[in-house]
């Protein structure tokens, strides 16, 4: 028979935006559409939070001497605002984090005397710690973009075309009480972000490769693709090897060879947005001489790749030709009749979708929301560190105007390339208000290494208490959970199995209505009992239990489930 033991992991997190309670190790087996997450409130262009970092002298010195080499200890706290300075709510309790500077040597890297960009790692020094389910925060300094809205508009365009891409918000940053000004709080592309969009990350064969300057899917250049998620050793990157081989030998055609290992429909949509937005510093290039840069390659469980954008601060500046050569995948597509037709369809889709999206209003409204914070940045400018405010109000206004001119002209330029009539611009709309602080007093506290296995009654007013696992039982064909909830709603149970290096779906999603009047049993029917039997001595079973309440703010808990086989 199987005995069940629970190893409580370091972090238990409260959830405030997702109607979910996760029991056991694992992330949502979600469809391709991004699932909600407790950190979603941070990642809206209408959200402006305030972040306080504290660095001891030793950490400050290390960042001055070795800015990108390592994470140094610091503390982190964040507060929501109503979108304008002076409206911040209570800050979260400070937590220990790792901090390093961010940026490339020839790009946005700045020192602490300047407007530095930062990476914050929540589990750098506290094992298993997360904040709102996140392991990292990425704070871009926007020093390459005086308008401070290029990235927001670019990712909005990618998302409108169905290209998986990071969400963004803004944060006003202070370090040791000194102003570092407005930063773009951009969603870090890591396993957590991928699982929101694509479901459980099973490695191998899944990977996330980062494509920095010059890296491409050709022999000699594919080694420059950095493995950000997934197995890194030689022989464990078969997905990338298959893609490189297909590109090198496109027989009988590029589409026929590359299509099985690359989602060319998705990639052509990404390239269409790159060209539309003038992203000369991306994958598809501008002249044929520009090296690929600022992209990710994500391989799904079958080893098929999608391409994800990154580093879009150089968009909306100058138009680039729609068929200017770039990376080898883009070039190969243009040389293939079928793929080129797909790309032109993607361009036509970009013309219709992005014109209707009214990016001009998005840019105008974002710049209006940021203006009071830019004024605050200027007001808090330190005479000792003037470079922490790199742009004047006039430079910002000029950059915003140039961005809007680009957006206004681009539909006609693309229509001319496609040989169609230019679309009429959409009517201007009033700007929506900034995101307001939520009803409770502050964002929820992060997970910590000493939290109990259930959340205490310190939840915000009006929230739903976390579902409570009463008991669990493993049968020959199913896992049975009995759960108590504090309100009416629906339970949804997903599961998958990891046995050594083998992974498989454990069960089909199960749904049950639940209420506070009685506990509810929900069953995960195993789809592969043979894999379970092959485990012999132990088995790791990952279950995700969502609780979708009729009302209120739900919570989240996590733990590990280990099954051990005993005789007797």
Language-model segments: residues:
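Bacterial N-terminal signal peptides that target proteins for export
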Residues: 2-19
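Bacterial N-terminal signal peptides
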Residues: 16-28
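Polybasic, low-complexity, intrinsically disordered segments
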Residues: 34-35, 405, 416-417, 422-568
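Conserved NTP-binding catalytic cores of kinases and kinase-like/nucleotidyltransferase enzymes
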Residues: 35-148, 152-156, 214
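Middle-to-C-terminal accessory/interaction subdomains
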Residues: 40-41, 46-50, 59, 234-451
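Structural recognition of the beta-strand scaffold that forms the well-ordered cores
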Residues: 52, 97-98, 116-121, 136-141, ...
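Internal "kinase-insert"/substrate-recognition segments embedded within catalytic cores
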Residues: 117-127, 134, 138-143, 161-166, ...
């Amino acid at each position: 028979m199987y005995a069940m033991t629970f190893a409580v992991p370091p972090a238990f997190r409260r959830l405030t935006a997702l109607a979910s309670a996760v029991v056991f190790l694992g992330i949502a087996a979600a469809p391709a559409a991004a699932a909600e997450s407790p950190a979603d409130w941070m990642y809206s262009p209408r959200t402006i939070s305030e972040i306080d970092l504290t660095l001891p002298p030793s950490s400050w010195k290390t960042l001055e001497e070795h800015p990108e080499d390592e994470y140094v200890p610091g503390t982190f706290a964040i507060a929501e605002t109503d979108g304008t300075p002076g409206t911040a709510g209570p800050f979260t309790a400070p937590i220990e984090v790792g901090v390093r500077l961010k940026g490339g040597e020839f790009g946005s890297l700045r020192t602490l005397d300047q407007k530095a960009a930062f990476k914050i790692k929540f589990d750098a020094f506290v094992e298993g710690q997360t904040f709102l389910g996140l392991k990292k925060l990425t704070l871009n300094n926007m020093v390459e973009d005086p308008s401070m809205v290029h990235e927001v508009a670019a990712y909005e365009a990618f998302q409108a075309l169905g290209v998986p891409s990071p969400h963004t918000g803004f944060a006003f940053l202070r370090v040791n009480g000194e102003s570092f000004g407005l930063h773009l709080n951009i969603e870090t592309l890591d396993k957590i972000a991928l699982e929101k969009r694509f479901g459980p990350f099973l490695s191998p064969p899944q990977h996330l490769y980062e494509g920095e300057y010059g890296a491409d899917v050709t022999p000699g250049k594919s080694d420059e693709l950095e493995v950000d998620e997934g197995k890194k050793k030689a022989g464990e990157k078969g997905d990338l090897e298959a893609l490189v081989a297909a590109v090198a030998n496109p027989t009988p055609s590029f589409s026929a060879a590359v299509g099985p290992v690359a989602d060319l429909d998705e990639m052509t949509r990404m390239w269409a947005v790159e060209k539309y937005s003038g992203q000369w510093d991306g994958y598809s290039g501008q002249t044929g001489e520009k090296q690929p840069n600022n992209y990710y390659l994500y391989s799904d469980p079958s080893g098929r790749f999608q391409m994800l954008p990154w580093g879009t601060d150089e968009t909306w500046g100058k138009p680039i030709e729609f068929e200017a050569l770039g990376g080898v995948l883009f070039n190969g597509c243009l040389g293939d009749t079928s793929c080129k037709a797909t790309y032109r369809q993607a361009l036509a889709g970009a013309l219709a979708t992005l014109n209707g999206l009214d990016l001009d209003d998005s840019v105008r409204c974002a710049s209006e929301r940021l203006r009071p914070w830019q004024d605050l940045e200027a007001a808090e400018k330190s005479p000792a560190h003037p470079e922490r405010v790199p742009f004047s109000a006039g430079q910002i206004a000029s950059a915003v105007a140039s961005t809007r001119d680009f957006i206004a002209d681009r539909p006609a330029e693309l229509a001319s390339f496609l040989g169609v009539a230019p679309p009429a611009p959409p009517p201007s709309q009033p700007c929506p208000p900034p995101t307001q602080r939520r009803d409770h007093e502050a964002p929820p506290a992060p997970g910590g290494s000493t939290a109990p296995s259930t959340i205490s009654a310190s939840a915000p007013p009006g929230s739903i208490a976390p579902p409570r696992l009463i008991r669990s039982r493993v049968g020959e064909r199913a896992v049975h959970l009995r759960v108590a909830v504090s309100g009416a709603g629906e339970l949804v149970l997903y599961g998958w199995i990891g046995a050594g290096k083998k992974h498989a779906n454990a069960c089909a999603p199960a749904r049950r209505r639940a209420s506070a009047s009685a506990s509810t049993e929900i069953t995960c029917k195993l789809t592969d009992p043979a894999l379970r039997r092959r485990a012999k001595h132990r088995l790791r079973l990952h279950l995700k239990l969502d609780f979708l309440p009729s009302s209120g703010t739900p919570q989240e808990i996590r733990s590990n489930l280990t099954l051990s086989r005993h005789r007797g």
